[in-house]
UniProtKB/Swiss-Prot annotation:
GO terms for biological process: cell division; cell wall organization; peptidoglycan biosynthetic process; regulation of cell shape. This is UDP-N-acetylmuramoylalanine--D-glutamate ligase. The lineage of its organism: Bacteria, Pseudomonadati, Pseudomonadota, Alphaproteobacteria, Rhodobacterales. It comes from the Bacteria. HAMAP family: MurD. It comes from Jannaschia sp. (strain CCS1). One of its GO terms (molecular function) is UDP-N-acetylmuramoylalanine-D-glutamate ligase activity.
Amino acid sequence: MGFVGRKVVVLGLGRSGLASARALREGGAEALCWDDGEAGRARAAAEGFTIHDPIRDGLDGVACLVTSPGIPHLYSTPHRAIVAAYAAGVPVDNDIGLFFRSLGQGDWAFHDTPPRVVAVTGSNGKSTTSALIAHILEEAGTPVQLAGNIGRGVLDIEPPIDGEVIVIELSSYQTELARALTPDIAVFTNLSADHLERHGGMGGYFAAKRRLFSEGGPERAVIGVDEIEGQYLAGQLVEGPEDGRLIRVSSGKLSGPGWDVSTRKGWLSEFRKGRQAASIDLRGVPGLPGAHNHQNAACAYGVCRALGLAPRVIEAAFATFEGLPHRSQRVAEINGVFYVNDSKATNVDAATKALGAFKRIRWICGGLEKDGGLEALWEAAGHVAKAYVIGREAEAFALHLGDIPKDVCGDMATAVARASADAQPGDTVLLAPAAASFDQYDSFETRGADFIAQVEKLQS
């Protein structure tokens, strides 16, 4: 990593922070660790790391400060240790930057095929797309590791073997700060308002995502072009419409001589140089319900085609993909009523896409509202029979739902019970909160687990 014999401060001692400290120590650096919480410091001390408060103990002789993704470094208020690093001229990086530096310095002379990295970013669909890429590669017999926001931390993966593909899911928190971003293939799924306070607005949010493409210049880029930001990004990356480095992905019809993958009415189609190269029916794939998952499938398809896989191999792998927990996860069918957990739909765009995947919906929503308002949901709510609102501020959230029929429930147990009592055979009780979970839960996973637990009570 280039820090042999040098001091590096690691700020934040959760999973990624401790992994960074271990990797730095193994690479010959002196890792100095700090966390504002006593528990984090205790974990680091138990592993033999030096505890070093960068404010109290200073930054003299420090070559770099490595921070965890959850710690603000710019907006809304940067952590004081990062401010001190800026003032002292100390570079600030994160585990993603360390990973790419380490990979770039690797000796792959004994590999017939050096490892390749696929990095996936975007507002929604990152996890499903990343997991689906890894699943397809595994089914095809290609060695693969899944890391980043999904799977293991990037510094916890095994040393890559010959021909292996490393698939990394990256959030805007990670792409914004990493000092090295050099994937072989980069994916941009879509963009919608999220994390705006952290990035100083929509422009800053998009700029954070865009760094994945502008910093390292990936050999291939798979870009969702349904939004103007994706169209702009695609236009910035190529020399002309026939530039084979770009694969455009859309839920609508695309034209031109380039390399395109589109999903319309449940069919995935690949076009190259204006001619159709493949067509796959996604309508009966149980692990990929709805138009939003078809877009995820198109992104994964584009990556795997760029890696040399045949369409029939990808199609066969689609059929065996089981989906991810808390993302359009079918939990149960009780008396003809379906229960679906999409707790990961933490913003308006994700919830809108979830609502578009089902016919008659009993919609459980609410939580910690994000910037941007909820008005965009109104048009997507045509299939909603009633909304069942949860959250500490459920009354206020309900006021933003317009004319959608609603029942202010407050907690998950009440919402599931009332939705179940109202539901008719053929209905779907859908948890798609359109909000963060932190008012009542410590994560969207915990919220989804509560939904599942309440449904299991109905079954028993």
